[in-house]
Amino acid sequence: MEAVPILRVGDVLMVSIQVDLHDQLAERLAGDVADAVAKHDPKGVLIDISGVEVVDTFIGRVLGHIAQLARLMGSRVVLV
């Protein structure tokens, strides 16, 4: 089962997506990031999608949703 690691580095969560992000994995990632933000209360969340070859409209919406959730929970979000 594929998973996207969420690493805590100081006051920042780093999410580095290095696998093909299919719909089910993207939805699971949204929940995992929300849980990690609630648990660690980071100042920022860095989402690295440089390893993703194709970002379709669904994946784009899920990434936007993840960013919106993190911002609502008080974290700044950077997508690279």
What do these predicted regions represent?
Residues E2-G31:
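STAS-typified acidic loop motif
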Residues A34-V37:
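Conserved alpha-helical scaffold flanking the Walker A/P-loop in AAA+ ATPase domains
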